[in-house]
Amino acid sequence: MSTLRESAYWQELWRERLPLSAAALGTGFSISLNMFIASVFVPAMQAEFGWTGAQISIAGSFGLIGLFTFPLAGRLADRFGSRRVMLGGVAAIPGCYLLYSFQSGALWQYYSIQALWSLFAVLWSATVLGRIAAGRLTLARGFGIALLLSAPAAIGAIAAPLLSELIDSEGWRNGYRALAAVSLGAGVIAAAFLPSQESAHATPLDQRPDREAMRAIFRSRAFRILASAMLLCNFGTIITGLQFAPMLLNRGTDPARVGGYLSAYAIAVIVGRFTIGLSLDRFSTRYVAALGMGLPALGFALIAGAEAATWAMLAGVALLGISQGAEGDIAGYVGAQFLGPGLFSTTFGLITATTSLAGFIGSVASGIVLNEGGGFGPFLAFLAVTTATGAALFLLLPRTPHSRSTNAPADT
């Protein structure tokens, strides 16, 4: 990047500092925050109600509702703007936190709230707010998307220990009530400072009929490549989620070292998010995407063949983390780059649904392999192959559009 372009890059970020800060605050307290804090409440509720881990795990199946709600939320954001749609989530998420605090121990109450969460919390998500960075930034689009997607992890790192202390001293019900109050306040502040559609550099709304917009997306060669690649690259979501620690133990890792590996993974996620975001702004989209999403293939292979507590194991975990951080940047950037910022949220919602479907398929596949007694080794080898194949698909993307600010689809 030339000196002149580099200067314009940072000037653009400075110009959009208030909208980006508001969007980052909003994304930080959005639905994504829950993945970093939800488990803090579980032990206390189990102790009071006698719920088993299996009973709580069933609630995770409600996440499949997101296959339908994320694309819908994205389409609403593209039609009516991020702020209007987000306000629905600002009511829903604190409301669900408050409802959790009034549970009496009946599982149907817990499941009902989880269902409400899956239906309405998506209105306050990166799918809705990401279009602010995608549309208001042209030179620094990758960095802006990375900034928004990193906010939940940063806030979660602060909130989780504070909530844990509050639960220990005041009980889990007051923990949920405090969380409801803080998230409501953050949501209102973020919404107040989000730019209006009449402001300068506003992301254009997509006013065409929904059927026409969907037809444009699915006819796009870039979208078909992106969706196929993300599907293949995300079968391993279960490994970097619920099965991460069990997988490390299965590969012979000392239990005392598991925490260290998880910390290394978390650091790698943040590094990957900003590294890939900056790279997307400077280098060819297809090559950056192929490299960023291809790293886990090597990571899975290293872990599958590594012995316990080796540098190969640590390197494999780090590669998984870097790619996990890169995933959202790549999905958002490719969608905005080839379909235009006006369709960012619809496209991002569809890709989020695709990755959720991939995670579900991967969970079923891993269960079959583990039930056969093969351990994680064969499944890791399978993931290495599918991930490498998915990453290679990014090389088929059309050449990057000459104009980074175009709002019209760049390919057919």
Segments the model singles out, each with a brief description of its role:
Residues 19-53, 73, 159-160, 240-245:
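Extracytoplasmic
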Residues 114-150:
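Cytoplasmic helix-loop-helix junction between adjacent transmembrane helices
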Residues 265-269, 282-334:
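C-terminal transmembrane helical hairpin of 12-TM major facilitator-type secondary transporters
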Residues 38-45, 220-274:
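Extracytoplasmic gate region of multi-pass secondary transporters
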Residues 69-106, 280:
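Conserved MFS/SLC helix-loop-helix module at the cytosolic interface between two early adjacent transmembrane helices
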Residues 338-373:
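A late C-terminal transmembrane helix in Major Facilitator Superfamily
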Residues 151-195:
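Helix-loop-helix hairpin linking two adjacent transmembrane segments in secondary transporters
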Residues 61-75, 263-275:
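Central cavity-lining transmembrane alpha-helices of secondary-active solute carriers
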